[in-house]
């Protein structure tokens, strides 16, 4: 009766280690399955991205224009159109044709203290542009979300000078679209001003 119910030490170790070994094996299988499923999802995602072609490859919207004066309470945005600029200026406003995030950078020096506000959407309040050197210098950069039909323009106010008499040195406005995959309005067809005579 001495040895009944008591197993030799080797058998105890073997029986005790088997369940732990099974759990480790099951855990490894589960982790491998999760990794395989994740890899499969990544491959499917990449394949879908390559197979879906964008509806229209529109150029990145960008503008670099001189700011040379003031007209009707707005800073005058000059037009220096070149092949790399894709945005249009109308009535001292930059017209936004494509949705996305845009970087807007303004710099310049004034001979008097001014206050400048950046406007871009009718239902939004303007962004106050902080000034340097007692309100006579601006170096301002902001990233904001703009959409089709928005108009970017700058209003200026000087306490003792009329808008038309403001003097600006080295004024420049740069607008660059950072995310070019949003909606873009179709480009307007070229309209010729030449009179056409029927044949």
Swiss-Prot record:
Chief location category: membrane
Domain THD: 59-176
GO molecular function: cytokine activity; tumor necrosis factor receptor binding; tumor necrosis factor receptor superfamily binding
Disulfides per UniProt: 70-163, 98-184
InterPro entries the record matches: TNF_CS, TNF_dom, TNFSF4, Tumour_necrosis_fac-like_dom
Location(s) in or outside the cell: Membrane
SUPFAM superfamilies: TNF-like
Record carries keyword Glycoprotein: yes
GO biological processes: acute inflammatory response; CD4-positive, alpha-beta T cell costimulation; cellular response to lipopolysaccharide; cellular response to nitrogen dioxide; cellular response to prostaglandin E stimulus; cholesterol metabolic process; defense response to nematode; immune response
Top-rank taxon, per record: Eukaryota
Ranges of the Extracellular topological domain: 49-199
Keywords, alphabetical: Cytokine, Disulfide bond, Glycoprotein, Membrane, Signal-anchor, Transmembrane, Transmembrane helix
Segments on the Cytoplasmic face: 1-25
Ranges annotated as spanning the membrane: 26-48
Record bears the keyword Glycoprotein: yes
Tissue expression per record: Detected in T-cell lines, but not in a macrophage cell line.
Family, per entry: Belongs to the tumor necrosis factor family.
Subunit text: Homotrimer.
This protein's name: Tumor necrosis factor ligand superfamily member 4
């Amino acid at each position: 009766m001495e040895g009944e119910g008591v197993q030799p030490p080797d058998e105890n170790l073997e029986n005790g280690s088997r369940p732990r070994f099974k759990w480790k094996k099951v855990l490894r299988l589960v982790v491998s399955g999760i990794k395989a499923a994740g890899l499969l999802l990544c491959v499917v995602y990449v394949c879908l991205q390559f197979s879906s072609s964008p509806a229209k490859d529109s150029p990145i919207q960008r503008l670099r224009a001189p700011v040379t004066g003031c007209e009707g309470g707005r800073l005058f945005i000059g037009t220096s159109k070149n092949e790399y600029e894709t945005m249009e200026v109308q009535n001292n406003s930059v017209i936004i044709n494509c949705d996305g995030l845009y970087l807007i950078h303004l710099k310049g020096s004034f001979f008097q203290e001014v206050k400048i506000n950046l406007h871009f959407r009718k239902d939004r309040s303007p962004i106050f542009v902080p000034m340097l050197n007692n309100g006579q210098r601006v170096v301002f950069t902001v990233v904001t979300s703009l959409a089709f039909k928005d108009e970017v323009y700058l209003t200026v106010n000087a306490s003792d000078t009329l808008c038309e008499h403001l003097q600006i040195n080295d004024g420049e406005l740069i607008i660059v679209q950072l995310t070019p995959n949003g909606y873009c309005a179709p480009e307007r067809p070229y309209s010729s001003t030449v009179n056409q005579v029927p044949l």
